[in-house]
Design a protein with these regions (language model features):
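N-terminal basic/disordered segments at the start of proteins
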Residues: 19-39
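Conserved N-proximal alpha/beta basic substrate-recognition cap immediately N-terminal to
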Residues: 44-149, 156-157, 167
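Short hydrophobic segments within beta-strands
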Residues: 18-20, 42, 156
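Short N-terminal or domain-adjacent regulatory/targeting segments
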Residues: 1-14
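Short, contiguous strand/loop micro-motifs
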Residues: 14-16, 111-112
Length: 169
């Protein structure tokens, strides 16, 4: 995939910012509007009613039955027609899958090569640690807990599967 050849065909005066409809998408399209861009939101069919209420922020909608439809040729064609640049958010890889996220032939704001790290909690924490960025202490079941901690269950996503604890019990 040669993103450069795709971008070369874009009319830079007609760029649009595209994102997946989620808790972060309204902030993304609001910022895009403030910067003078047109906007597009890809949304699930059962959620389109909600996002249509923000038509002052969203110029174009693509309605899909599954997030993984993002990589369908008709969806890609529509995004290219609108000269879209995808702005991913925290749910992007989880929603569309790593393969689609990395290979969709649409320009992405940021590095698509970071998606594999974003999708793997251990790789992500290792990168942060190696970069000198403080990360939370990781406890094992054998560790003594001496303060309030946030426990993340395996597979926890989207704010679910977490709880607070002050002891191993």
């Amino acid at each position: 995939m040669d993103i450069g050849s795709i971008v070369a065909k874009y009319d830079v005066d007609r760029l649009s910012i595209a994102t997946l409809a989620s808790h972060s998408s309204l902030q993304i399209v609001h910022g895009a509007k403030l910067e003078g861009f047109r906007t597009a939101v890809i949304t699930l069919r059962d959620r389109v009613w909600f996002y249509r209420q923000f038509s002052h922020l969203i110029d174009n909608f693509i309605v899909v039955d599954s997030w993984r439809d993002l990589c369908r040729e008709d969806v890609v064609s529509k995004l290219r027609e609108w000269y879209s640049i995808i702005v991913p958010h925290g749910s992007y890889v989880e929603y569309v899958g790593l393969s689609c996220a990395e290979t969709i032939p649409i320009p992405i704001f940021g590095s698509r090569y970071m998606f594999s790290i974003e999708a793997d909690q251990h790789k992500k924490m290792e990168l942060l640690k190696n970069s000198g960025i403080p990360i939370p202490k990781i406890y094992t079941l054998n560790d003594e807990i001496d303060r309030l901690v946030i426990v993340k269950l395996p597979g926890a996503k989207g704010g679910r599967g977490y709880f607070l604890a002050t002891s191993r019990e």
